[in-house]
Amino acid sequence: MPKKSDTTRKLEDVGIEIDGDVDSAEEDKKSKGKGGKKAAGGKRGKASEDGEDEDEDDKPPKGRRAANKKKPAPVDEEDSDDDIPQRRSAGNRRRGNVRERGDGDKKKSGKKGRRGGKKNEKGKGKDSDKDSDKDEKKKKNSSGDESDSDEEDESMSEGEMAKLMEEVEEKKKLIANIRNKPWRMRRRLKVLKEAQQFVDKFEGALGKGKGRKLYAYKVMMMKKWIKFKRDFENFRTACIPWERKIKEVESHFGSSVASYFIFLRWMYGMNLVLFSLTFGLVVIPEVLMGLPYGSIPRKTVPREDQDTAMDYSVLTDFNGYCKYSVLFYGYYNNQRTIGFLKFRLPLSYLMVGIGTFGYSLMVVIRTMAKNADVGGGDGEDNEFTFAWKMFTSWDYLIGNAETADNKYASITTSFKESIVDEQENQKDENIHLRRFLRVLANFLITCTLGGSGYLIYFVVKRSQEFQNMDNLSWYEKNELEIIMSLLGLVGPMLFETIAELEEYHPRIALKWQLGRIFALFLGNLYTFLLALFDEVNAKLEEEESIKNASIWFLKEYYANYTANNPNDTGTPPPINPADAIRGPCWETTVGVEFVKLTISDIQVTYLTILIGDFLRAFIVRFLNYCWCWDLEAGWPSYGEFDISGNVLGLVFNQGMIWMGAFYAPGLVGINVLRLLSSMYYQCWAVMACNVPHERVFKASKSNNFYMGLLLLILFLSLLPVVYTIMSLPPSFDCGPFSGKERMFDVVMETIDLDLPAFMGTLFGYVANPGLVISAVLLMVLAIYYLNSVSEAYKNSNNELKKKMQMARDEEKNRRNNKDSTNQVMKDLEDLLPNRPPTPPSPRENIAEKNQGQGGKSAKVKPGTAGGVHLQKDVSLASANPNARGPVTRAPGPRGPGPLPGQPGAGRGQGPPPRRQ
């Protein structure tokens, strides 16, 4: 065997085929004699001696490359050749078909120069000429590399294209769900970066030919659209008002306190829309296009009141200039159209009044429907509560220290809430004593409600007597507002004291407390309305006499003017608006009462927070060191946030706004300012002055209980306004409906004058009582049917939940009891005559083989009866005989022997099992 050179041996060891230029003449002849032994696999022709054949051999066949390729090359023509992945089969790699470019050629030429006596007959000059020819031909062929790569990409089969598409989709899913992976952050970032690089590199390769650029453009636009939606969602979340404040409160005081501020924010949004409707369609048109102040009597302060119209005491009572302003009903003119736009102000006033209730009703019902499904389908929350909170509560993407502190406080509070729920579920009680105490508590609360209603009715009657008296004190002027505010302040505290007898769960106790305070506020409000309507009826009687007197006064004025100026044939000058006789304008009187009630409620609420919370916390904080007892642990201690009182205060105040907005359009703006200031003021108070409740509890996942109270008071607030519109006659000298029999007549006037005749006929048919009653009955039947269907669906869902829970429990028991440790169950299993066979485990197979060879007896499992084979030993609790049994041994190092399921793979220090 001829001896090979060192260079040849090294090149063959690494799998590089030796070309004719490298070998010497003798080796070239010997290689020819061996019949092309160095040709890999015989599939490729012998390498030629010139550079052109060598370059062609460097490129693999296109067909084989397309068949063996798993990942396509980049599709862009601008990509370099280094980016094209080299795909070769395993057989070609074993045969040494991998060739080097560029640097390999330089190494070959360098090694040729160092060979000395084994040079070729052509010499150095010929070798250098050949190398230069190779470089020139490579440059000529470099222009065709890009077209060759494109042809190779286009030669991908449909299966490879589908496989690549699946891989790209999998990477996209991984990118979308990377947060849900239980990995460390370093691994998440690494996997995310790799997936993004893979998608960016191969997503454009899914197009073909001319459609590739269009596909790449679509992919780019899709990415930009997804990024835009994500940024817009972040922007919309950032635009939610007071989100950070509410989250901070929730983290320290629990979800129950945060639910109040969420409800307050929702109320602010709804009132902002009502404010836009009222000011945009009523107040601003009257200010811009209506008659100015002082032009007519309803817009002018009477002459006898002008001297005191700007006094502070008068303005705080909303008299003087406040009474004759756009804040109240009486300021608006009854002209059918105003301004150059011919704006129909009376119709707009009525439609806005009705639309306020319509929009509020729609928003409340929609919110309740949206929250109805919140909290459904969360069966896992009822099991392993503390395990879920322990292992899934923390957010590992938090990077802010303040956010981490809030999250820590929130998790701590949620654990306290769950502990309270667990304690309430396990509490034992004396049922008879509990029933007696609850009946007693309800009796005391009923007496309190009745007494507060009688007190308000008595005060309203007394205030009517004060109106005819002069030189009243401040208390006598504001007695009604003071009594109602004090009842709203003292009543909830009294109810909370009585509720201690009942010992309800905190969440249930909160609902009872809310219901009782709601009954107190609603009773007070309706008592106030009944007493107020008695005053309205008295003013209507007074208005008739004043109307007759004003007509007589006008006739007397014209007669006196004609008598005093007999030569004047012109029209007499109009009466000065300040000197005209005024009616009582009962709508403005009602509006003033509602505004005063709202302002007094705001004052009492803010003073209560300032004195009852801030001053109390100040005393406890700074006087505790020099006091006789511990002020923090004993009396007075820090205050707790009164959820029920504050929620019912909001609901009660909103009911007054709905009722009074028709008589005082400016009341909606006052309420918006109140809610805006309450958010900042109460957030500061609760964070600075209050402490969390001793019994922290979770709020309901939806605020539907609050919404239910709001819906009820909305309906009850609608009744007085509808009664006013349809039944009571408007004042004759103030307001947009003056001069009409009923306020609703403005709609009939618009239909008769502005719409075609058939519209009036159609509206008359629609307003027919028979049709209205039929429609109402149909709606009631539809509601009953839908409610029945909803109850049926709810029962079906509950049954399905029970079945799913039973199936989950059964599967859990079956999995846990596969290898029963109960001796009685084992004895019962041994006595069963017929059992389904199970395939033997690998250990049993090895034991049987050893028994067949060595003649040893088969091992008998402890506890099994005689004559029962080990293969037939099946647990009663196992439904699947092929299921793997649980691990019943203690964890520890595995001994010598094969792994389970791998008889030939030894593990440990012992030898592997003997092979047959």
Curated annotation (Swiss-Prot):
Its main location: membrane. Pore-forming subunit of the mechanotransducer (MET) non-selective cation channel complex located at tips of hair-cell stereocilia. Highly permeable to calcium and likely transports monovalent cations. Residues 1-159, 804-916 are annotated as: Disordered. This is Transmembrane channel-like protein 2-A. It comes from Danio rerio. Keywords: Cell membrane, Ion channel, Ion transport, Membrane, Transmembrane, Transmembrane helix, Transport. One of its GO terms (molecular function) is mechanosensitive monoatomic ion channel activity. Residues 14-26, 145-157 have a biased composition (Acidic residues). Belongs to the TMC family. GO terms for cellular component: plasma membrane. Residues 293-344, 460-478, 538-649, 726-762 are extracellular. PANTHER family: TRANSMEMBRANE CHANNEL-LIKE PROTEIN 2, TRANSMEMBRANE CHANNEL-RELATED. Signal peptide: none annotated. Residues 31-45, 62-72, 108-117 have a biased composition (Basic residues). Residues 1-13, 97-107, 118-138, 804-818 have a biased composition (Basic and acidic residues). It catalyses: Ca(2+)(in) = Ca(2+)(out). Interacts (via N-terminus) with both isoforms CD1 and CD3 of PCDH15A (via cytoplasmic domain); this interaction is required for mechanotransduction of the hair cells and correct localization of PCDH15A in hair bundles of the hair cells. The keyword Membrane applies. The chain crosses the membrane at residues 272-292, 345-365, 439-459, 479-499, 517-537, 650-670, 705-725, 763-783. InterPro entries: TMC, TMC_dom. GO terms for biological process: cellular response to mechanical stimulus; detection of mechanical stimulus involved in sensory perception of sound; inner ear receptor cell development; lateral line development; vestibular reflex. Disulfide bonds: none annotated. Residues 883-892 have a biased composition (Low complexity). In adults, expression is restricted to the hair cells of inner ear and lateral line organ. Expressed at higher levels in the larval inner ear than in the lateral-line neuromasts. It is a multi-pass membrane protein. It is found in: Cell membrane.
